[in-house]
């Protein structure tokens, strides 16, 4: 049945005899072959770089009991070797479980398509860390000369999601490493993006990790620095506030609600630390527009400054604002 509908395309790729059965997907009937998982090589351009051992062992235990339910997607090279397009984690777990045959769908596609398939699977399963996802987006864009909008359509994401992910690649290597190891979240990393001094960015990232700051606290710290303050200023204000009882409606770590102290200290901190609500609105605008946004003023009156770096970027922003 599979052979009649598929013709010789896939069968020509398979010289060895193997057990097969047919499954249906959006592309029609596809033949599934049972192959030794140790023959399947990892795709060198796979976006995902790390596999948690504990997670693999849990999947291996499930595979021992139920088998590999979803076939791996792979391609056979001209030299007879097999390369995984999607399903490397399943393959690793199957080997760990001791299986000598797993279901594999054979497909031939170009490099860009293979990357897109692997990326979509990983993103849908939330397997990639934020930096792996950003690098994969960039790689596919470079290969296909795609715009943010075109890539967003291919992987089923909002354009702003793609833009915000790619901005993480501008962070210093040390901060990217923290992001890869999930020591920093994507929210923490986005808060650091407005710091233009790379060494300061690294120092703030280390402070955020050491003191286990929330994303909101990290945003407040960066806001303090962008207002002309120092990391020492922020740390002092945070320690002062944490040591005092919170005011009604405030919190022990809300540095925008500082307890009474000397007038000079209050005036300095007032000038350096923005209202948390303003910072939150600023962050939301950044995520929606995909570019740096700065709000000067307060909740009653002020000015919004939107940064762009080219005519194309200006036209894109104009289109977004006009649509709303």
Curated annotation (Swiss-Prot):
Keywords linked to the UniProt accession: Chromosome partition, DNA-binding
Region spans: Disordered: 240-266
A Gene Ontology term for the protein's cellular component: chromosome
GO molecular function: DNA binding
Top-rank lineage group of the source organism: Bacteria
Biased composition (Low complexity): 242-252
CDD domains per record: SPO0J_N
Function: Involved in chromosome partition. Localize to both poles of the predivisional cell following completion of DNA replication. Binds to the DNA origin of replication.
Family designation: Belongs to the ParB family.
Name of the protein in question: Probable chromosome-partitioning protein ParB
């Amino acid at each position: 049945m599979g052979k009649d509908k598929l013709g010789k395309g896939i069968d020509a790729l398979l010289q060895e005899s193997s057990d097969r059965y047919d499954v249906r997907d959006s592309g029609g009937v596809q033949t599934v072959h049972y192959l030794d998982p140790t023959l399947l090589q990892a795709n060198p351009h796979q976006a995902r770089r790390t596999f948690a051992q504990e997670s693999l062992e849990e999947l291996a235990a499930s595979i021992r009991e139920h088998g590999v339910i979803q076939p791996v997607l792979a391609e056979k090279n001209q030299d007879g070797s097999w390369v995984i397009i999607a399903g490397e984690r399943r393959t690793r777990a199957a080997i760990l479980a001791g299986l000598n045959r797993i279901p594999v769908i054979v497909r031939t596609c170009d490099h860009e398509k293979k990357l897109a398939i692997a990326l979509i699977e990983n993103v849908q399963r939330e397997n990639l860390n934020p930096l792996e996802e950003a690098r994969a987006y960039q790689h596919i864009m470079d290969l296909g000369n795609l715009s943010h909008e075109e890539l967003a359509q291919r992987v089923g994401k909002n354009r702003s999601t793609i833009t915000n992910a790619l901005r993480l690649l501008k962070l210093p290597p040390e901060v990217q490493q923290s992001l890869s190891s999930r020591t920093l979240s994507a929210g923490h990393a986005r808060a650091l993006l407005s710091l233009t001094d790379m060494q300061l960015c690294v120092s703030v990232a280390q402070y955020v990790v050491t003191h286990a700051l929330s994303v909101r606290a990290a945003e407040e710290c960066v806001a303090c620095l962008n207002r002309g303050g120092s990391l020492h200023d922020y740390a002092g204000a945070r320690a002062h506030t944490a040591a005092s009882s919170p005011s009604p409606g405030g919190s022990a770590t809300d540095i925008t609600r500082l307890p009474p102290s000397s007038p000079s200290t209050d005036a300095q901190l007032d000038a350096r630390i923005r209202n948390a609500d303003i910072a939150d609105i600023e962050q939301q605008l950044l995520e929606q527009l995909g570019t740096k946004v700065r709000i000067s003023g307060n909740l009653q009156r002020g000015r919004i400054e939107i940064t762009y770096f080219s005519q194309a970027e200006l036209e894109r922003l104009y289109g977004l604002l006009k649509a709303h």
